[in-house]
């Protein structure tokens, strides 16, 4: 009589753990791809700012691309948070009590991954045909408005971020702006003649002191 092999019983918890592992692998894959996509889009954003130095903040493509980058970052964070939530459910001793929540959470996680996958399709078309992407733009705006509770004006924050990028690309322009904003001395009263003479004497004395301290150093060399 041969010994019968014992049949391995796979529990619902085992299946849930397997699903979480699959989700984790998918999220890691999409994270790498999305990070690379965001780097490319940030480079495109800088190019657009260079090409539109005067009206980059009012340029529809510029604003749309920056919002899209924020949207992608938000999706990645959502996917990561959802995965942590699922892992916590699986680790509970009473998995049956949260099984329904787990299944719903898994569905939500898959929906997020579908949205991330959509970001890789027709990237150039989305950039070149912004006017025809009304539904997509609305989805981005609604998602960001829900995720940025407490932010008084998201559009103002976009302006500040674009200004920071423009300053990074054109530091000389920013320095010139700082100089232009310095208070002017025009119209201020001149120093009285006696004070001008004293100031001149102090400057000459300081110059002589500097030259005196340099002479011993020259002798030592």
Curated annotation (Swiss-Prot):
The beginning of the lineage is:
Eukaryota, Fungi, Dikarya, Ascomycota, Saccharomycotina
Stretches of Basic and acidic residues bias are at 197-215
Under InterPro entries, the record lists:
Snf7_fam
Organism listed in the record = Saccharomyces cerevisiae (strain ATCC 204508 / S288c) (Baker's yeast)
Q: Where is this region: Disordered?
A: 170-221
What other note does the entry give for this protein? Present with 937 molecules/cell in log phase SD medium.
Location in or out of the cell: Endosome membrane; Vacuole membrane
- Asked whether the keyword Transcription is assigned, the reply is no
Designated name of the protein: Vacuolar protein sorting-associated protein 20
> Disulfide connectivity?
none
Question: Subunit structure, briefly?
Answer: Core component of the ESCRT-III complex (endosomal sorting required for transport complex III). ESCRT-III appears to be sequentially assembled as a flat lattice on the endosome membrane and forms a transient 450 kDa complex that contains DID4, oligomerized SNF7, VPS20 and VPS24. SNF7 oligomerization into a membrane-associated filament is nucleated by association of SNF7 with VPS20; the process is terminated through association of VPS24, possibly by capping the SNF7 filament. VPS24 subsequently associates with DID4/VPS2. Interacts with the VPS4.
> Keywords assigned by UniProt?
Coiled coil, Endosome, Lipoprotein, Membrane, Myristate, Protein transport, Transport, Vacuole
Q: Which family does it belong to?
A: Belongs to the SNF7 family.
What's the main place this protein lives? membrane
Q: What is the topology of this protein in the membrane according to its UniProt annotation? A: Peripheral membrane protein
Question: What task does this protein carry out?
Answer: Class E VPS protein implicated in concentration and sorting of cargo proteins of the multivesicular body (MVB) for incorporation into intralumenal vesicles. The lumenal sequestrated membrane proteins will be targeted into the vacuole after fusion of the endosome with the vacuole. Acts a component of the ESCRT-III complex, which appears to be critical for late steps in MVB sorting, such as membrane invagination and final cargo sorting and recruitment of late-acting components of the sorting machinery.
Quote the annotated effect of residue 2 to A: Loss of membrane association
Listed GO CC annotations: cytoplasm; cytosol; endoplasmic reticulum; ESCRT III complex; multivesicular body; vacuolar membrane
What domain of life does the UniProt record list for this protein's source?
A: Eukaryota
Q: Which residue(s) hold a covalent lipid per the annotation (N-myristoyl glycine)? A: 2
* GO annotation terms (biological process): ATP export; intralumenal vesicle formation; late endosome to vacuole transport; late endosome to vacuole transport via multivesicular body sorting pathway; peroxisome organization; protein transport; ubiquitin-dependent protein catabolic process via the multivesicular body sorting pathway; vesicle budding from membrane
Coiled-coil blocks: 72-178
